[in-house]
Amino acid sequence: MNKARLKARTLVFLAFLVFALPYALHAQDHDQDLDENSKINTNLGFALSAPLNPLAQNTNFGWGFEVGAGYNFSSRHAIVGEFLWNRLQPTQEVLTPIRVALNTANVNGHGNLYAWTANYRYELRGRSLGAYVIAGGGFYYRNAHLSKSVTTGVSASCTPAWLWWGFVCSSGQVSSDQTLASSGSGAFGVNGGMGFTVKVDEPRYRFYVEARYHYAPNSRVNTQLIPITIGIRF
C-alpha cells in the first residue's frame, strides 16, 4: 500500500510540475495583456462526479478538483491542458465479499482517479454570460485501496467486486493465494462535455459550471463518469 501511495503522490507532483511550468515561463512577461483577449487561460474548480456503469456498480460518487491552463487562439477557440483528481467512494456491495472473506465488518476502502488531458474548447462569450463545448483525451490512472490486506482462499466465486479490488479470476472462481491491499490501472481515454460561464470580476474572472463525460478502458472495470465541476476561470 505504501508503494501505491508513493506512486499516487508522484503522479500528483508531476501534474503540479506540468501546470506550474506555463506560469513560470510567463512570470517575467509583464507586457502580457490579461484582458478579455488574453492568450492565456487558466481554471480551477471543485468536481463532484456521478459514476456510470460498470463503474457505478462499484462506487457511489466521486469528489475532487480540476486544474488547467492553456492557450487562446481567439475568443472562441482554445486548447486547454487539465489535471483531474477524483476520490472514489466504494459501494457496500463491493465491500461485502471482502468483509466475508476476512470474517469482519471492519474493512473499508477507497479509490482514486487521476487524469491528464489535452482538450479543445469552442466558446460563445457575451459580456456577462457564455457557453462552451469541450472535448479531448489523455491518460487516466485509477487505483483502489483496502484498509486491510486480503488473502484469497479456494472457494470464493468471482464477482465484479473482486475484480474492482484487482483480484484475478479463473473459471468463475477467484484465484487462490492472492494477497492484495491495493491495485492500479492506467489507460488512454476520451472526454467531452459543455459548460456555462458568468463574469464575476475584472479583468476577466468567470464563474463556470461544467458537465463532462469521461471514458477510459481501464483493466477489469472501465472508467465511465460525469464530473460536475464548479469553479473560476481566468
Ranges and model annotations:
Residues 1-37:
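Cleavable N-terminal export/targeting peptides
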Residues 23, 27-73, 79, 226, ...:
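Short glycine/proline- and aromatic-enriched beta-strand/turn motifs that initiate or cap beta-hairpins
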Residues 30, 63, 70-156, 201, ...:
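Gram-negative (and chloroplast) outer-membrane scaffold detector with strong preference
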Residues 44-48, 65-71, 118-122, 135-139, ...:
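Residues on the lipid-exposed face of transmembrane beta-strands in outer-membrane beta-barrel proteins
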Residues 51-55, 101-108, 176-182, 214-218:
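Extracellular loop and loop/strand-boundary signature of outer-membrane beta-barrel proteins
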